[in-house]
Amino acid sequence: SIGWDWKLLASLAYKESNFDTSVVSWAGAKGLMQLMPRTARIMGVPEGKEYNAEESVKAATRYLKLMEKSFKSIPDPDERTNFVLASYNAGIGHIFDAMALAEKYGHDKYRWIDNVEKYVLLKSKPEYYNDSVCRNGYFRGLETYNFVREIRARHNIYKEKIKE
């Protein structure tokens, strides 16, 4: 278990697949949680089970937990979650680059909103993706920027509407 509110995981699933277990992205990600085939294998999804909702959620939570360990230096758990969500979408390397850029340019590398997310967007400009602190090159960050914001907004709606 990752220890996240189930409504946050549901928000991620909705954003990824609109709860459609049969969907395949343009990049080849499959199923409810839109895992890339290689990631699905590494996270334990058996061959041919990519579209199984339970397998997809289990693998996604293992993957999220693994990424969360990479951000253990971020003290605030809500902030850490933003970085994990961004990495789920973008790949961890681009997020590490954006953190390095934020630090270099005087922003808080442990805060997502108005800090690191800004550099995710700027990684589409050569003066940023060619910066010596970047290791992963060009990145079109608008999708990731919106991804985190939309999941957080949907999670807030779910928390408001679904009382436990």
Whereabouts are the PLM-identified features?
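Secretory-pathway/luminal and periplasmic proteins that interact with or process carbohydrate-rich
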Residues: 17-26, 67-73, 90-105
